[in-house]
Every structure is written in structure tokens, then in C-alpha cells.
Swiss-Prot record:
Its main location: plastid. Binds 1 Mg(2+) ion per subunit. RuBisCO catalyzes two reactions: the carboxylation of D-ribulose 1,5-bisphosphate, the primary event in carbon dioxide fixation, as well as the oxidative fragmentation of the pentose substrate in the photorespiration process. Both reactions occur simultaneously and in competition at the same active site. This is Ribulose bisphosphate carboxylase large chain. Gene3D superfamilies: Ribulose bisphosphate carboxylase, large subunit, C-terminal domain, RuBisCO large subunit, N-terminal domain. The keyword Oxidoreductase applies. The basic functional RuBisCO is composed of a large chain homodimer in a 'head-to-tail' conformation. In form I RuBisCO this homodimer is arranged in a barrel-like tetramer with the small subunits forming a tetrameric 'cap' on each end of the 'barrel'. One of its GO terms (biological process) is photorespiration. It comes from Victoria cruziana (Santa Cruz water lily). The record marks K325 as: Transition state stabilizer. Its EC number is 4.1.1.39. Its cofactor is Mg(2+). GO terms for molecular function: magnesium ion binding; monooxygenase activity; ribulose-bisphosphate carboxylase activity. It is found in: Plastid, Chloroplast.
């Protein structure tokens, strides 16, 4: 036998620390880990902690120039998933210093940047994150939040009503504005650009903005209520996106919209800052979420994407409908709806909430029930979501 061992080391030795007491400032993550056959769960959990913090596959001399104990992620608890073979929940604690302040982008690059392609894992899913106040306080959060939005709109004690203009692609700007007027005049609070309406050849963004603004002012004058249309500012560059938001502000409309996953968190945070500085509400659509959150055992659960959006900033976010879905889905959906709206959310595994989350004073986000709902769903929707929600039809 050879007298030395090749330098690939066991992660367990350094990164699996079952005795670790988590700090109030740590960012905590719950991963659903499916190890490859033959890989012990402790090694898989430790590998996740290592690869998403200070680890690399071997020992390098520069390790001696820093304090691993201060900067390493630690897998501090592992439990098997009930009813699933070879699946475990690995809990990982990250020291706060690993993250740039006020950057959701950096948080995700660190926590989910590399580990998902890891050989020792068959699959990996980020189920939940605990964001400590020490970190969340470095974010502005939603431009306005639920209470300020109600004050701006002068609408209280009920869900807000909206609808998406259809056909979503192909209408001219003038006919589009006409549909907006009819909906708002008929009693809706909001109408919405579809998520893929940006600035296509058949309807350029500025034409749409102008005709929709005309519709809003006409409907407001006739009803005596404040009306809005989610003008989609999503664009190919963040400069162009801000340009569209500036135009919306100059037109005096109340709200713009962004596709935050396709547009990206950096662009979204910039837009949220602009919206707060200029009194615009920000409606967030989650196009592309199912690419990331649909698989049970791999990807990122939507509750994490929802928490990230509350930090990055948005006043509304699409969050599923529950109606007509499975019962279990209902509790989980209501779990992340609470994470969006409330200040303090208790750990509750039955609702998929792995950690107690304290948002301190960060404004809340209105959940938007959207997608395949119609008027007969109203009683169920109001019962499920309560007053602080947007019911988005069409």
C-alpha cells in the first residue's frame, strides 16, 4: 500500500459540529439533502456547509492566514426526513461576516452559488433561511409596505382587486388602454401588465404607459377613487428599467411592476430604492419561480425566494392561490404569506417554517393571489388570505 493518502479530505472533520450553539447573528439555513449512495449524511451536510462558506476540496497553505473558526459555515444538526428514504434536513449556520450588507445577490451567491452541483449529493434543496435582524437591518426592504400603501390608495378593510389585461400579447397601445379604462371604471382597484409585456414591436412601452395613464386618470375622475395599473418596467438593462420607472413617476401614476427573478435581485433592489425615493409602489411578479422551486428534492423553496424579495424590496408579490390545490399546500402557502406580512413568525414545521423569523420593523409585502382564479373563488380566497392581500383575476 502507498505510504500517504491523497489530499482529498473529509469535510466532517471540520464542518460537522453537532455541539455548536447558534448565534443570534448567524444566518441559518435548512437544506434537504439527498446524498449519493454510500455517502454518509454527516459528510453530505458538512460538504454543503464547507462549499457554501470557506471550504475547498483540499488543504491550502493560505488556510493558515485566516481564522477558520470565525468564518466557516457549520452543519450543526441533521435529521432524517420522515417518510422519505435517504433524505435528510441539514441545518447550517453561517457567520454574519461572510455576507455583504444589503446584498441579496451576495447572500444567494454564497449560500446556493456552488453547492448544488456537488458530486457527493444526488439532490439538494434550500428549504428555509433564518435572516437575523443584524442582517435584515442592512436592507431597505419594501419601498412602502402594506400600511403606507393603504394610506396612499385610501382603501381599507378589504383585499384589493385587480385583473390582468388579456390578450396579453398583440393589442395595440390604444386598445390596451381602452381595456384598462373599462376594468378600472367597472370597480377594480388595479389592472396589470402581463409579465411578458415589456416593449415589443406591436406595443412599445412608452405608448402603453401614455394610454394606460389616460385610462387611469379618466377612471379616477369618474369614480372618485384612486386607481392604478402595474406598468411593467422590466427591461433588458437595469438602466432602461429605471428609465421606464422615471417615466411612470413623471406621468404621476401610483405603481410600477418588475419580474424579479428574470430581472435579477440586483436590478430589483435598485428599482425598489428608486420607488421609495420617488413615491412609487412596486408590484413584483415571480416569473421563472417554478424553474427554481417546483422539484420537491432539488432547488430552492419559494418561501426563501419570498423572504429574499421582502429584503430586496417589493410591495406586492405573487404567491400562489391555494384554491383547488392540495390541502397540504394550503398550510405551506399560508406559512410564507405570513412570512411576507407579519413582523414575527414562529417556527412551525407543519407549515414548512423551519426557523422563527423576526423582521423587527421591516415593512410587510401584500401577497397576490393570481393565476386561474375567478369570481366563484372569492369566498375561499377571502377566507384564506384575509384582508391584506391582492386578488388578481385573469
Amino acid at each position: 500500500s502507498v505510504g500517504f493518502k491523497a489530499g482529498v479530505k473529509d469535510y466532517r472533520l471540520t464542518y460537522y459540529t453537532p455541539d455548536y450553539e447558534t448565534l443570534a447573528t448567524d444566518i441559518l439555513a435548512a437544506f434537504r439533502v439527498t446524498p449519493q449512495p454510500g455517502v454518509p449524511p454527516e459528510e453530505a451536510g458538512a460538504a454543503v456547509a464547507a462549499e457554501s462558506s470557506t471550504g475547498t476540496w483540499t488543504t491550502v497553505w493560505t488556510d493558515g492566514l485566516t481564522s477558520l473558526d470565525r468564518y466557516k459555515g457549520r452543519c450543526y444538526h441533521i435529521e432524517p426526513v420522515a417518510g422519505e428514504e435517504n433524505q435528510y434536513i441539514a441545518y447550517v449556520a453561517y457567520p454574519l461576516d461572510l455576507f455583504e450588507e444589503g446584498s441579496v445577490t451576495n447572500m444567494f451567491t454564497s449560500i446556493v452559488g456552488n453547492v448544488f452541483g456537488f458530486k457527493a449529493l444526488r439532490a439538494l434543496r434550500l428549504e428555509d433561511l433564518r435572516i437575523p435582524p443584524a442582517y435584515s437591518k442592512t436592507f431597505q426592504g419594501p419601498p412602502h409596505g402594506i400600511q403606507v400603501e393603504r394610506d396612499k390608495l385610501n382603501k381599507y378593510g378589504r383585499p384589493l382587486l385587480g385583473c390582468t389585461i388579456k390578450p396579453k400579447l398583440g393589442l395595440s397601445a390604444k386598445n390596451y388602454g381602452r381595456a384598462v379604462y373599462e376594468c378600472l371604471r367597472g370597480g377594480l382597484d388595479f389592472t396589470k401588465d402581463d409579465e411578458n409585456v415589456n416593449s415589443q414591436p406591436f406595443m412599445r412601452w412608452r405608448d402603453r404607459f401614455l394610454f394606460c395613464t389616460e385610462a387611469i386618470y379618466k377612471a379616477q375622475a369618474e369614480t372618485g377613487e384612486i386607481k392604478g395599473h402595474y406598468l411593467n418596467a422590466t427591461a433588458g438593462t437595469s438602466e432602461e428599467m429605471i428609465k421606464r420607472a422615471v417615466c411612470a413617476r413623471e406621468l404621476g401614476v401610483p405603481i410600477v411592476m418588475h419580474d424579479y427573478l428574470t430581472g435579477g435581485f440586483t436590478a430589483n433592489t435598485s428599482l425598489a430604492h428608486y420607488c421609495r425615493d420617488n413615491g412609487l409602489l412596486l408590484h413584483i411578479h415571480r416569473a421563472m419561480h417554478a424553474v427554481i422551486d417546483r422539484q420537491r428534492n432539488h432547488g430552492i423553496h419559494f418561501r426563501v425566494l419570498a423572504k429574499a424579495l421582502r429584503m430586496s424590496g417589493g410591495d406586492h408579490i405573487h404567491s400562489g392561490t391555494v384554491v383547488g390545490k392540495l390541502e397540504g399546500e394550503r398550510d405551506v402557502t399560508l406559512g410564507f404569506v405570513d412570512l411576507l406580512r407579519d413582523d414575527f413568525i414562529e417556527k412551525d414545521r407543519s407549515r414548512g417554517i423551519y426557523f422563527t423569523q423576526d423582521w423587527v420593523s421591516m415593512p410587510g409585502v401584500l401577497p397576490v393571489a393570481s393565476g386561474g382564479i375567478h369570481v366563484w373563488h372569492m369566498p375561499a380566497l377571502t377566507e384564506i388570505f384575509g384582508d391584506d392581500s391582492v386578488l388578481q383575476f385573469g
